[in-house]
């Protein structure tokens, strides 16, 4: 069975993805990347939700320090703008994808569905390979 890493938020889109991926023949491993602002009890709730929906395993990773050191400080110093208008401070998605790829390597799988994108779930964007 092919393994896939799904970046899991517990929201509608990622909650749909777990049973859908299982139906498509994948062994689903979920990952929640905590970039700050979520309690330990909320993390536990996300873990339980992922398992209840059918995930084989769930992992929580805290990247609060990495977000500050590797993303926010350099972006603030750069003055970078998104679409020449908005400060580029919503860049935690890069850490989410990075942690997802690490888990892919640990599981020896090449399938990933990071989801943190500016679009609603569309099957044509599904299941990227590492």
Residue spans of the language-model regions?
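ATP-dependent adenylation/nucleotidyltransferase module used to activate substrates
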Residues: 1-130
């Amino acid at each position: 069975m092919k393994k896939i890493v799904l970046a899991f938020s517990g929201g509608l889109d990622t909650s749909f993805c777990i049973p859908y991926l299982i139906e498509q023949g994948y062994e689903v491993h979920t990952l929640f990347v905590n970039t700050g602002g979520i309690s330990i009890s909320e993390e536990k709730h996300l873990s339980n939700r992922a398992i209840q929906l059918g995930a084989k395993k769930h992992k929580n990773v805290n990247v609060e320090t990495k977000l500050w050191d590797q993303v926010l400080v350099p972006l603030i110093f750069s003055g970078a703008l998104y679409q020449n208008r908005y400060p580029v401070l919503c860049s935690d998605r890069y850490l989410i994808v990075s942690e997802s790829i690490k888990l892919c390597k640990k599981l020896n799988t090449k399938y990933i569905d990071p989801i943190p994108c500016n679009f609603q779930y569309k099957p044509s964007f599904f299941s990227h390979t590492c």
